[in-house]
């Protein structure tokens, strides 16, 4: 009998359900010495409607639940017996009306085979089925996501008050396991990177001055879904041109990628497709017309040098804070060479001048969430400018997956503030930096996995100035018609 898997046909990836069985086994191994006799109980994501209407949101599974069970349906629960490793899925018993509006109602056996779990029951049976197992306690998930500031949703069901509940043990253990990826998980993340990389290359091929930013966003979304089965993107697409590229999270509801792209604009496209809930996060920066000006080339190559230096230095036991500082130092050195800054770079580092041009952190964990969990397990957040925006301050470990995304941005209002601060103004060549007002910014974001001796690049897009110009020129020669 063939192994159960998730697969969307055509050229999309088959993901084996053994990925989740391996995750459950890892969790049981960690819990056996700490909570023998207990049962893990976790609640999946719920179906919901939009505001006060009956319009359903497009469902996306809760990440911890997906990590353990890989279930695509909403309103489910999962349990794992720590003593035996037995996996139990609880699915809702659907009303007969579901058959008319939503389709076939499957029996429990269907879900047992689909997700390769040991048992499947209905959610209204949770209390009775768990009571028969006589658990020492139920381990529920409760903890803080340090990226969002939100807590995980703790499982609840009718009858839970009859059980001893422990909500302290599970969160730090399962979160740390999510930080260190298995080979099967890395394969899916690499697939998401592959299809997203191709979509970014498609954008470089088809972009033309005069188009709207959202048209390129649309092209990306179409490509990753049509070619790769990525129904979801991992975050709101950033399709920024010109000065919009200096807004770190451009593309939101108040600025919905709606500018007309001008000839001469520098573009910054930060987009990632999501496959089977596993994410990618790639940023490409390039000139709208396919040819870098000297000004654009100087800033771009400064960021690329920073990106590649960090990539070369990443390996187990290296501090992520040190990687951020390395990126800062290189970019300050390059800005000095371009005549935008002056003075001693080490003195610039002391006043955190790098945060003026790169106010965000160097990168973040990547996995089932684009800003993946575990960044501040057992470590403290830094307080200095720039460093306080890091999403982790941990040392690197083998099989961590992270983004490397240095950037240089010319945010006029922030630069003008710095020019009024004597401790920073002394390093800024005012007449030079003013030539970059309206430039926007450059970010180069790649996804990597830490290996035994270094790191492996998962992203595959043109990166040097020559590669980008060659790729964009070839696209123009092969496709003279503008894609609308």
Q: What residue spans do the PLM features occupy?
A:
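Active-site neighborhoods and metal-handling regions in enzymes and metal-associated proteins
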Residues: 1-484
């Amino acid at each position: 009998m063939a192994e159960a898997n998730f697969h969307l046909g055509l050229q999309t990836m088959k993901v084996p359900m053994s990925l989740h069985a391996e995750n459950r086994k890892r969790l049981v191994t960690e819990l056996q010495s700490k909570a023998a006799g207990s049962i893990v109980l976790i609640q999946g994501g719920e179906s919901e409607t939009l505001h006060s209407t009956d319009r359903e949101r497009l469902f996306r599974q809760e990440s911890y639940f997906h990590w353990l069970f890989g279930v695509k349906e909403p309103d489910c629960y999962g349990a794992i017996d720590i003593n035996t490793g037995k996996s139990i899925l609880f699915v809702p018993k659907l009303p007969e009306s579901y058959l008319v509006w939503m389709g076939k109602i499957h029996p429990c056996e269907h879900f047992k085979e689909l997700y390769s779990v040991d048992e499947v029951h209905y959610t209204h049976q949770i209390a009775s089925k768990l009571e028969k197992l006589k658990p020492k306690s139920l381990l529920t998930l409760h903890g803080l996501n340090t990226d969002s500031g939100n807590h995980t949703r703790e499982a609840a069901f009718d009858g839970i008050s009859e059980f001893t509940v422990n909500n302290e043990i599970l969160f730090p253990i399962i979160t740390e396991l999510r930080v260190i990826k298995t080979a099967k998980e890395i394969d899916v993340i690499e697939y998401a990177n592959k299809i997203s990389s191709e979509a970014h290359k498609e954008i470089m091929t088809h972009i033309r001055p005069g188009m709207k930013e959202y048209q390129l966003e649309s092209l990306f979304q179409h490509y990753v879904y049509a070619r790769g089965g990525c129904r979801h993107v991992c975050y709101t697409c950033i399709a920024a041109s010109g000065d919009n590229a200096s807004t770190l999270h451009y593309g939101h509801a108040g600025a919905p990628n709606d500018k007309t792209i001008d000839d001469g604009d520098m573009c910054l496209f930060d987009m990632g497709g999501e496959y089977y809930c596993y994410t990618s996060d790639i940023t490409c920066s390039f000139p709208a017309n396919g040819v870098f000006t000297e000004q654009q080339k100087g800033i771009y190559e400064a960021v690329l040098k920073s990106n590649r230096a960090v990539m070369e230095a990443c390996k187990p036991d290296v501090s992520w804070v040190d990687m951020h500082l390395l990126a800062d130092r290189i970019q300050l050195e390059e800005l000095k060479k371009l005549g935008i800054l002056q003075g001693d770079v080490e003195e610039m580092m002391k006043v955190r001048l790098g945060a003026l041009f790169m106010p965000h952190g160097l990168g973040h964990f990547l996995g089932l969430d684009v800003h993946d969990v575990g960044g501040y397990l057992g470590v403290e957040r830094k307080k200095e400018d720039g460093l306080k925006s890091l999403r982790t301050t941990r040392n690197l470990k083998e099989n961590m997956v992270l983004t490397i995304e240095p950037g240089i941005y010319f945010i006029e209002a922030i630069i003008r503030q710095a020019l009024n601060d004597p401790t920073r103004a002394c390093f800024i060549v005012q007449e030079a930096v003013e030539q970059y007002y309206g430039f926007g910014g450059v970010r180069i974001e790649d996804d990597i996995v830490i290996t035994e001796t270094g790191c492996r690049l998962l992203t595959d897009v043109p990166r040097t100035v020559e590669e980008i110009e060659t790729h964009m020129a070839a696209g123009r020669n092969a496709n003279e018609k503008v894609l609308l």
